């Protein structure tokens, strides 16, 4: 099943590989048109790319998205009015219950004041790009590096591949309503793509997180698109 993140990844590939703007926009249009009947999926693509160059490109490539963007704004406005009229105190997405890592603080600060929901994709991409730049391409190197910067790592080489991180610094002493270790997930994805010599795009999803009360963080990796 195609999700918004997979579409965004394919759009990024088009952006990076198509040299001429006309060809780039046509390829993006053809891709987005495939999902024209799934408005909620396209809305999610718009939300996750908000504030980026890619966002502007896809609006140019596929003008019908402008109407969906208006719908998103109207929906957000209604939610805001409902919240204000209800007089409920606005809750933080993530709260701290003790000393947290600098990255955890920066992430929540950017979410609250600047990035909103976009923080998820941005920190995922940062982690992924960092791993790719480091050139980590073996499980042993991945475990060694993550032990220093994230936490204790156990890799279950099953299908799908599962990575368990204990005492993850990204979420230690954090409390949230959903998994929040986007940087860790992206980093794992980058390492695994290196291990496949970038033959596949790898998607990593955090299914358990200490921030929501789980005993450890669990990440599941899946190869989503073959590139060769």
Curated annotation (Swiss-Prot):
SMART domains: V4R. Gene3D superfamilies: Trafficking protein particle complex subunit 3. InterPro entries: NO_sig/Golgi_transp_ligand-bd, V4R. PANTHER family: ARSR FAMILY TRANSCRIPTIONAL REGULATOR (PTHR35090:SF2), DNA-DIRECTED RNA POLYMERASE SUBUNIT I (PTHR35090). This is Uncharacterized protein MJ0855. It comes from Methanocaldococcus jannaschii (strain ATCC 43067 / DSM 2661 / JAL-1 / JCM 10045 / NBRC 100440). The lineage of its organism: Archaea, Methanobacteriati, Methanobacteriota, Methanomada group, Methanococci.
